[in-house]
Amino acid sequence: MPHLADLVASAKAAITSAQDVAALDNVRVEYLGKKGHLTLQMTTLRELPPEERPAAGAVINEAKEQVQQALNARKNELESAALNARLAAETIDVSLPGRRVENGGLHPVTRTIDRIESFFGELGFTVATGPEIEDDYHNFDALNIPGHHPARADHDTFWFDATRLLRTQTSGVQIRTMKNQQPPIRIIAPGRVYRNDYDQTHTPMFHQMEGLIVDKNISFTNLKGTLHDFLRNFFEEDLQIRFRPSYFPFTEPSAEVDVMGKNGKWLEVLGCGMVHPNVLRNVGIDPEVYSGFAFGMGMERLTMLRYGVTDLRAFFENDLRFLKQFK
């Protein structure tokens, strides 16, 4: 089939001349498509005697295979050339600075907790923790809070049943520590607490830090000196501070501590007092031998005062525009 050799030679020449994959595909269709030159050669077999058809078909298939191999080889060449051209056009300048990695930062409330733990750690306080699901004994009874106290009401406390609740303060940590450890005791107890309240200055969950010292000859003067030093260290100012008489069931005497704000108004920052003798008796400590003081403060409130934040809820909304200000 001399005409077949001419078709193969013509196909190979066209393949070599193709300058891109699209042109090469046109050659493939022209010679190997359904109506391609080589494909149509198969229709000529019917004109041959039956005994010659197998040999002639094999020759045609061999010709088609040669063209297909030439197509594959040329396609690889064209694709490789196109890739090299694209890589050359997209040369990376390795001297350019890379994409900047965004640095993370501590949440402002976490910053406050770390700062307070660092200060009291230098005074010999250790960090103590306890369960967030409490029983009414550790959350109320042991702290000299009677059954008729309003803090036990459903509208203030999240109750699971008649005796279990989400703790409303970290004071239960103090009770457990005093029951399991003999004086001298010097701890701070940070953690999440829960109260049924939600507005611009209250959230159902917030962070609290309580402190406790129990030892011989602990006085209110020790309490005042400790908190004076703490507040001036925390706010990094020589603040005007006042202790205002107050009432807490678990301390006697009790006080609330205010600092003078930049607007000339007093701002409440924490509550404190001398540990009530009944609380000491409840944990097996003799109030005739030992005394102590305790204090408690909201981490969000201190953070708001330190950074000038006006809405407590911003701490819980995870708005990066807000949080990035505290890096």
UniProtKB/Swiss-Prot annotation:
Subcellular location: Cytoplasm
Protein origin, superkingdom: Bacteria
Cross-referenced Pfam families: Phe_tRNA-synt_N, tRNA-synt_2d
GO biological process, one term: phenylalanyl-tRNA aminoacylation
Record-linked CDD domains: PheRS_alpha_core (cd00496)
Binding residue positions for Mg(2+): E252
EC category: ligase
Textual note on the cofactor: Binds 2 magnesium ions per tetramer.
GO-annotated molecular function: ATP binding; magnesium ion binding; phenylalanine-tRNA ligase activity; tRNA binding
Enzyme Commission designation: 6.1.1.20
Primary localization class, coarse: cytoplasm
Cofactor: Mg(2+)
InterPro entries in alphabetical order: aa-tRNA-synth_II, aa-tRNA-synth_II/BPL/LPL, Phe-tRNA-synth_IIc_asu, Phe-tRNA_ligase_II_N, Phe_tRNA_ligase_alpha1_bac, Phenylalanyl-tRNA_Synthase, tRNA-bd_arm
Gene3D superfamilies in the record: Bira Bifunctional Protein, Domain 2
Subunit note: Tetramer of two alpha and two beta subunits.
Name of the protein in its database record: Phenylalanine--tRNA ligase alpha subunit
Record organism: Cronobacter sakazakii (strain ATCC BAA-894)
